[in-house]
Amino acid sequence: MEYKPSGFEVTTNQLQGSPEVWPGDGIAAFKWVGTGVAHDVDTGKDFQPDFLLYNPLVAQGADYYRGICDSLRPGYWLNTCAATAQAAGGVTFGPGTIGVDASNMLNHLGTTCHGLALKRGRKYGFDMAQFNSNGSTPVVVNHDLGGSPDMILFRWLSGASGAAPDWYVWHKDLASGYLLKLNSTAAAFDGTGIVTNVGAASVTFNMAAGTDLFQAYFFKSIPGFSKFLIRAGNANADGVFDNFRFNPGAVLNKATNLTGSWILQSTALDPQNKATKTTIYPSQVDAPYTGATYLADFVAQGRKVRDASNVINGAYNYLVCAWAKQPGAYSNAV
């Protein structure tokens, strides 16, 4: 029987308009199969990425790590499943490609991997910065988003203090002072004082960690291109409609006031809506889940959730990060 999604908003020219940019301008969700030898992976888009969130589509073992690579740290990767130091390896970034080395981390022979690649720039709502802490003295870190960030991801890189290299997540709609951790399933915790003075040009961090090196990733919603929000679930199989005002290519999701998984869904994992959904766990060692739980349709204006599970749509609040498969008419990404 053909599966026909229902209950979502109909596309009209008034809602979406005519796309002004090619879909590949700034975000790519894609898969590749490891060869065991160094090679370039085609992202399916033309732009040169600056950031890669990757997941081998198997349970994590000694050769199968989830992590983040970026253009500020060429030749290094960061594990998103654990609070561990950065390690040598990673990828190189080229126009429309990522270059993987011969190591098993991203290139295990025969293993399929998923990547979410982003381009840095004001018009894409994404920036990165490295900074040194200064003991208990707050440090002002500049960014170039052209407006206040909606979300910040940051962590320790190196230094004598040996600070816990957790992946801290700040969002403007979390309770004041509260943070999540990307490398944890825990609910948001009180991190008052760590992130303050979030503004259009800078953010103040107080890491209380000597002169250690940290890295921050800044995200800002761009109309028609990306969205970073917190919304309530309805605990109903006829779930909420996440109105992004664009057709999503990738969505990252986490309950904020409940212990629960970070989950990522994308059009690379499921090119079409169907009665099951492939879901990966960026911060857990589990293999991808394929089934009717976490079911959600990617539609013209957003995501229609069709599940009442606590991970995606219980009676809790959820951080939702979405990037467009097709940017809408009002995107700045031109």
Regions found by a protein language model. Give the residues of each.
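Surface-exposed molecular-recognition determinants
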Residues: 2-334
